[in-house]
């Protein structure tokens, strides 16, 4: 297959590139800073020569978007919004100009589109979508993606949870704070954490490509969300950390100022279930949190 990954130089893109290349596929990366032969320049805003790479592509995956791991002041909020909307808009324009369009287009979204929920399990069908900055970003992103219907292209929005891997994302940071004795619960610890092992993330993307009946919205998350308190306890156990200091909300607020991030990333309860993956027969290699982190710690 010929696979194009827009914004593919980050944690998820690197792992997808490795996964699909090892399976014998041609993978090309659209990036602002091309360094390798398979990397193609684009600015994620305007049509350029990169458009030609979409011709006869089997798969287009768009992961473009400024990281949400920052303070939500007006400049950052605008960049978070525009980086997602503009890239989706220009890809649609490029796809429309293709004579032989990609067969499937997967666009990043986020499991944070669902409301803070400790009890209600959010599925694609019965998930409750709320109204704040993060949720509205996701809603606008998906609306832009699905705005134009191309009958010959299968579109899938990936509502992805926290992805756990050793070479990026949240897991290396969680390991570090736990080893430093700071691996207690954050806030009340009741907030649910939806997560997925990086291997299952890549496998799920491959599975969606192969299953032509899958389109629309899909939750990319493991079937076993855990509370923040449980997550940190299991991490302490596997890392043999004798204790872990808890962090109250006020402490997290102060720390987030110094770290230039938002407490929402730790305190929001993301209680999400991959109903469509499960119902359609996808098999997780790591359905449980403990087995997932054991594998990562042994890797």
What is the predicted role of each segment?
Residues 208-259, 294-297:
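Mid/C-terminal beta-alpha module of Rossmann-like enzyme folds, strongest
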Residues 129-133, 161-168, 188-198, 209:
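Glycine-rich "substrate-gating" loop/helix at the edge of Rossmann-like oxidoreductase active sites
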Residues 89-131:
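Conserved Rossmann-fold NAD(P)-dependent oxidoreductase catalytic core, especially the SDR/UDP-sugar
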Residues 3-23:
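N-terminal Rossmann NAD(P)H-binding glycine-rich loop of SDR-like oxidoreductase domains
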Residues 175-184, 191-225:
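Alpha-helical substrate-binding/gating segment
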Residues 143-166:
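Conserved beta-loop-beta element that borders a ligand/cofactor-binding pocket
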Residues 40-87:
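NAD(P)H-binding glycine-rich loop region in Rossmannoid oxidoreductase-like domains
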Residues 242-243, 263-299:
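C-terminal amphipathic/interface module of NAD(P)-dependent oxidoreductases
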């Amino acid at each position: 297959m010929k696979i194009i990954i827009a914004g593919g130089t980050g944690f998820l893109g690197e792992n997808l590139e490795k996964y699909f290349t090892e399976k014998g596929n041609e993978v090309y990366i659209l990036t602002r800073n091309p360094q390798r032969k398979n990397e193609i320049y684009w600015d994620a805003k305007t049509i350029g020569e990169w458009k030609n790479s979409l011709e006869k592509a089997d798969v287009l995956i768009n992961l473009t978007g400024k990281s949400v791991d920052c303070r939500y002041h007006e400049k950052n909020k605008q960049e978070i919004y525009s980086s997602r909307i503009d890239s989706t808009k220009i890809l649609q324009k490029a796809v429309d100009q293709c004579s032989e369009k990609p067969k499937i287009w997967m666009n990043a979204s986020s499991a944070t589109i669902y409301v803070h929920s400790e009890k209600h399990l959010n599925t694609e069908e019965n998930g409750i979508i709320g109204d704040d900055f993060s949720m509205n970003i996701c809603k606008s992103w998906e609306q832009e993606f699905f705005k134009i219907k191309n009958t010959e292209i299968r579109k899938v929005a990936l509502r992805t949870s926290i992805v756990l891997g050793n070479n990026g994302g949240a897991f290396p940071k969680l390991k570090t704070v736990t080893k430093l004795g700071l691996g207690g619960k954050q806030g009340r610890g009741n907030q649910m954490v939806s997560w997925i092992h990086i291997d299952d993330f890549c496998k799920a993307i491959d599975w969606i490509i192969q299953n032509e009946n899958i389109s629309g919205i899909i939750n990319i998350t493991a079937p076993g969300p855990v509370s923040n308190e449980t997550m940190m306890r299991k991490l302490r156990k596997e890392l043999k950390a004798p204790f872990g200091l808890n962090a109250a909300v006020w402490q997290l607020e102060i720390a987030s100022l110094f770290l230039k991030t938002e407490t929402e990333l730790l305190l929001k309860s993301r209680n999400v279930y991959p109903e469509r993956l499960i119902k359609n027969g996808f098999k997780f290699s790591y359905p449980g949190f403990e087995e997932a982190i054991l594998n990562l710690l042994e890797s």
